[in-house]
Amino acid sequence: MADYPITAIVLAGQRAGVVNPLAERAGVSHKCLVPICGRPLIDHVLQALASASNISEIVISVEEDAKSGLVPIIAAHQRADLPIRCTPAATGIVDSVLAAAEGRDGPFLVTTADNVLLDTSAIDTVREELAQADAVFALATDKAVLSAHPDGQRNFYRFRDASYANCNIYGLADRAALRAAEIFREGGQFQANPGRMIRAFGLSNILLMRFGVITLPAALKRVSRKLSFTLRAAHFTNGALAIDVDNERTYAVCEQLLAKREFSAQ
């Protein structure tokens, strides 16, 4: 297994002026502080990262007014060999990643504070793929996701070989690979903005993927050529890793899966 030091970046910010419904319901300032199974969302993510091999540092991208609530959570996971610090979240995902990576050469592991089902096996899988790539993103098949929970995910990317859901964990080999994050510069979901997809991946590639006439490996080769760096996919057999706490529905799903996992660990 590939094992090398890696900096973990946890995106925990939220849009300025927008009150997250889950945070409002829980009476907290930020979604990352919403409790699930008795602990804040981000606490579950930090636990997974702190339990993983060779995480050299954890950087949390978050607004200043959330830091006081994070102090005891950080204290529970920080060690002499694992510093955890906060850096101000920027206005978008890309700028937040760039700010969190400032002054560091990489490699980087990027995830989100609502990725509560993250585990060490997922981190190891991404690390393994990143040893052979500039950038890595993670996927689980629709069968794996629906097997984990029938209501866990409703959006899948259809390829000729299978349909996949995205998992919110990414690997970037070095600072040069941060240009991969520029794909998301405009923010939002690709599915809602075809023009954004075309600019990022090229029209011919989008058409091949849109109509499911190309396999995922073939698509990765074509997109790698388009972007001029090696892009690889980490395949997760655990479909639960494609389920984040996005809304009331997925909160309930994650709560059920977390409780089941914690019971099994006893």
Regions found by a protein language model. Name each.
Residues 57-63:
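Short internal beta-strands
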Residues 72-109, 117-118:
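Short phosphate-binding loop-to-helix
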Residues 48-55:
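Short, acidic, metal-binding catalytic loop of nucleotide-sugar glycosyltransferases
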Residues 24-43:
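Short catalytic helix/loop segments, enriched in acidic residues and glycine
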Residues 118-224, 236-240:
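Conserved core of the sugar-phosphate nucleotidyltransferase
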Residues 65-71:
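Short, charged/polar "capping" segments at the starts of alpha-helices
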Residues 247:
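Short, conserved phosphate/pyrophosphate- and ester-handling motifs at nucleotide-, phospho-/glycolipid
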Residues 1-27:
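N-terminal nucleotide-binding beta1-loop-alpha1 segment
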